[in-house]
């Protein structure tokens, strides 16, 4: 954990459907920089998710259990409202490509309009995770491919179970 002069709570938001090793890498790196990390698992009702919000929260809790100072909370509605509720002034966002940057840049400006003083910190993935996304993992799993190298073991097991239920 960070030993900064001022304690700081940050939020790393996402749908995490499913959480990948890339997400976990960003969480671990964020954990090294900030005192308190809240993983905000978004309900995302407009997305056709593989896992329910409750399942995604439970999987994330299992995956980050080894990290003191990291908590997991589900939320619905606007991210800025969740940040306000959590009294967090910093959002952590992962950037894989310039397309991600353009999208996140637009969101950041909107966040600042809705919650003045909110800041976004952008982290790029380590090279081995640069291509990785939840969408890719779901597609590989649905088509019978091996996902063990892309997600934590508990997540791979949960995905396998979910895919088998749908068949």
UniProtKB/Swiss-Prot annotation:
GO molecular function: ATP binding; pantetheine-phosphate adenylyltransferase activity
Keyword Nucleotidyltransferase in annotation: yes
Compartment list: Cytoplasm
Binding site for ATP: 15-16, 23, 94-96, 104, 129-135
Lineage: Bacteria, Pseudomonadati, Pseudomonadota, Gammaproteobacteria, Vibrionales
InterPro entries hit by this protein: Cyt_trans-like (IPR004821), PPAT (IPR001980), Rossmann-like_a/b/a_fold (IPR014729)
Enzyme class per UniProt: transferase
Family according to the record: Belongs to the bacterial CoaD family.
List of residues binding substrate: 15, 47, 79, 93
Subunit (UniProt): Homohexamer.
Keyword Protein transport assigned: no
CDD domains: PPAT
GO biological process: coenzyme A biosynthetic process
Residues with site note (Transition state stabilizer): 23
Metabolic or biological pathway: Cofactor biosynthesis; coenzyme A biosynthesis; CoA from (R)-pantothenate: step 4/5
Record-linked SUPFAM superfamilies: Nucleotidylyl transferase
Cofactor or coenzyme needed: Mg(2+)
Name of the gene encoding the protein in the UniProt record: coaD
Role summary: Reversibly transfers an adenylyl group from ATP to 4'-phosphopantetheine, yielding dephospho-CoA (dPCoA) and pyrophosphate.
Pfam families given in the database record: CTP_transf_like
EC number, UniProt record: 2.7.7.3
GO cellular component: cytoplasm
Protein name per the record: Phosphopantetheine adenylyltransferase
